[in-house]
Amino acid sequence: MPPKSLSNLSQTAGVNQSGFFPGASERDFLPATDRTTAEFVIRCVIPSLYLLIITVGLLGNIVLVKIFLTNSAMRSVPNIFISNLAAGDVLLLLTCVPVDASRYFLDEWMFGKVGCKLIPVIQLTSVGVSVFTLTALSADRYRAIVNPMDIQTSGAVLWTCVKAGGIWVVSVLLAVPEAVFSEVARIDGLDNGSFTACIPYPQTDELHPKIHSVLIFLVYFLIPLGIISVYYYHIAKTLIKSAHNLPGEYNEHTKKQMETRKRLAKIVLVFVGCFVFCWFPNHILYMYRSFNYNEIDPSLGHMIVTLVARVLSFCNSCVNPFALYLLSESFRKHFNNQLCCGRKSYRERSPSYLLSSSAVRMTSLKSNAKNIVTNSVVPNGHSVKQEMAL
């Protein structure tokens, strides 16, 4: 097999988002002495991990979206963005993960030219939705903490829905070039055989993978992470400053408000950390392979690194519900309630709020909801009006 083709086929199904190669597996490029171990890993361990990722990811994300849709008190700005994250993850879990899993059992690309064009677009769209939504979430936390007078209104929720839709549109548009360049090609194997595979760019083009890997790293990782870092720098600076400049008579109330805001910022930061941890290995591995286009490492160790990077990238689609479950007591109670059939809706039985950008929403045990207006104090000491549903 020519080195170029080998490089294409062995690249990870990660950051280039076109690297789904069910027709070719890293085991095809291993020395014969390593293939027994590789076969065990590929036939037993990897499919089990994929099945676990799909099952856990779908359960967590679908329940998360259901909780937000069925509890009106939770339809806040940050929750809309979190639901957007979950929707993108569900799309990835239902399409890309099963297709990638098939590569360990099929010797040919079985999804045709349409699948070769569509699957890379879906994966890149999902990653775009994730990273751009995390950036929007960080911007929302920045406004909520640095500009505390900007209180959430019903119009803000509608505008956030528009932003979420815009994120999907932008993500799809940025992913369209994947469909343009991806193609099904016939590849010569090591054992004088050949197979069909979906490759992300023409086999003879050595410049394309370098440009592609750098652009993907910048647009889907480095630039958003830089923006998020700037937001959190200002968030941290504001929280530290406000902690030393609170009026004494409002200290107790404002302290609770500050704790709530810090908790919300912490949740978003955990989401960002999970994304970085899961996707960074794929970015590095893809750029390494793109800039060493004419070389290939057929060792078992290299195959394991590739598989770990691939599995990590898909794990990002199921970790957010777990993070929310651990960090939010209210979500944890709602989630447990959803899993217990036959019980009354949790929103009818207990006070609840999950993530609210500024207004505090409560539900009553014994009476219908009614609105009252109260005065509250924000971290800069100003008194503002805040609506509570009791």
Curated annotation (Swiss-Prot):
Task: List the InterPro entries.
Answer: Bombsn_rcpt-like (IPR001556), GPCR_Rhodpsn (IPR000276), GPCR_Rhodpsn_7TM (IPR017452), NeuroB_rcpt (IPR001642)
Entry-listed glycosylation sites: N8, N16, N192
Q: Which residues lie on this side of the membrane: Extracellular?
A: 1-44, 98-117, 177-210, 288-305
Q: List the disulfide bonds.
A: C116-C198
- Name its GO BP terms in alphabetical order: antiviral innate immune response; G protein-coupled receptor signaling pathway; negative regulation of interleukin-6 production; positive regulation of osteoclast proliferation; sneeze reflex
**Principal localisation:** membrane
Task: State the lipidation positions (S-palmitoyl cysteine).
Answer: C341
The residues on the Cytoplasmic side of the membrane are 66-76, 139-155, 232-266, 329-390
GO molecular-function term, one example from the UniProt record = neuropeptide receptor activity
Q: Which residues cross the membrane?
A: 45-65, 77-97, 118-138, 156-176, 211-231, 267-287, 306-328
Entry's family note? Belongs to the G-protein coupled receptor 1 family.
The entry's protein name is Neuromedin-B receptor
Species whose genome carries this gene: Sus scrofa (Pig)
